Every structure is written in C-alpha cells, then in structure tokens.
Amino acid sequence: MNSKGQYPTQPTYPVQPPGNPVYPQTLHLPQAPPYTDAPPAYSELYRPSFVHPGAATVPTMSAAFPGASLYLPMAQSVAVGPLGSTIPMAYYPVSPIYPPGSTVLVEGGYDAGARFGAGATAGNIPPPPPGCPPNAAQLAVMQGANVLVTQRKGNFFMGGSDGGYTIW
C-alpha cells in the first residue's frame, strides 16, 4: 500500500513509582453534637409570636435596591421572651419593597409552552416552598402589589421547554 513504510513507534510513558500523595489520606473532623429535640412544627415556624410587643423597634430600610432582603436579622441585645430549642431565630419585618397598589412586571415568568385556556389558573401565584426564598412575583403579591407575568418567548431554533422535539 504505502512504499514509505510505517510510522515510528512512540515511546511509552515511564511508569511512576507509587509514592505518598500530596493530600492527607484521612481528615479528622470533630463530630457534630446529636440532636436532642425534634425539629419545630411548621406552624411554630410561622407563628408571629417570637418577639414580645414593645420589646423591639422596627428598623427602617430604603427600598432603593429591589434585590434587598425583606427581613433583617434581629439584634442580639434585644430582649425577647424565653427561648427554647424549638423556637427559631426571629426576624424584623422591613418596609415593603413594592408599594401597595403598584404593578410589577415579571417578564418571561411563564414557560413558552404554558397554555391559558378555560379552567387555567393563570391568576394564581403560589407561595414559595418551605425553606426557599420568594421570587419577585411572590414578594409583590405578598405586599399587595399587582403582578403582570409574560410568557417566555420560544421559537423553532431556540426550542421550547414544552416537551416537544425537532427532527433534523
């Protein structure tokens, strides 16, 4: 086939002797203390009775930046009621980010495959799951603002997330 011959053989990689790795094999960490009580019930976490009336004042916060947190952690010097192991840390409510009666536009909040026909619940924004921070639409609804949510645009080339596929 080829009159020039074969390609030269490449030398093999030299075998490395086994040595001590650079990282430690075992890392000794202190063990966390075991739980003594069951976690608090869901209803206890959202009961507005952690701070006694008159024990604390509510700090004011500017709504200059919409990404700001809705709650500030409570100062350590504030006198609160008897704390047990089942009561979580209390938070001060902060002034609303969205004024009541204002309208908030959430662009691309609905999927491109979302359908709004008879029986659709397009006007219902569900609360955030436990342990998850609320999104902009949920914050606006919680503060009494109106919310307009638009559909995310989908096209043939970018595809959609409605479960379909394109055959090339």
UniProtKB/Swiss-Prot annotation:
Keywords: Cytoplasm, Nucleus, Phosphoprotein, Ubl conjugation
Motif (PPAY): 39-42
InterPro entries: DAZ_assoc-2
Gene Ontology biological-process annotations: positive regulation of RNA polymerase II regulatory region sequence-specific DNA binding; protein destabilization; stress granule assembly
Subcellular localization: Cytoplasm; Nucleus; Nucleus speckle; Nucleus, Nuclear body
Region (Disordered): 1-25
Key word Cell membrane present: no
Processing and modification events after translation: Ubiquitinated by SMURF2, leading to proteasomal degradation. Ubiquitinated by NEDD4, leading to proteasomal degradation.
GO MF annotations, alphabetized: p53 binding; protein serine/threonine kinase binding; ubiquitin protein ligase binding
Residue(s) carrying Phosphoserine: S77
One Gene Ontology term, aspect cellular component: nuclear speck
Domain of life according to the entry: Eukaryota
Bias (Low complexity) ranges: 1-13
Described function: In unstressed cells, promotes SIAH1-mediated polyubiquitination and degradation of the serine/threonine-protein kinase HIPK2, probably by acting as a loading factor that potentiates complex formation between HIPK2 and ubiquitin ligase SIAH1. In response to DNA damage, localizes to the nucleus following phosphorylation by HIPK2 and modulates the expression of a subset of TP53/p53 target genes by binding to TP53 at target gene promoters. This limits the expression of a number of cell death-mediating TP53 target genes, reducing DNA damage-induced cell death.
Oligomer and partners: Interacts with SOX6. Interacts with DAZ1 and DAZL. Interacts with IL17RB. May interact with FAM168B. Interacts with INCA1. Interacts with EIF4G1 and EIF4G2. Interacts (via PPAY motif) with NEDD4 (via WW domains). Interacts with transcription factor TCF4; the interaction results in localization of DAZAP2 to the nucleus. Interacts with transcription factors TCF7 and TCF7L1. Interacts with transcription factor LEF1.
Protein name (database record): DAZ-associated protein 2
Natural source organism: Macaca fascicularis
Gene: DAZAP2
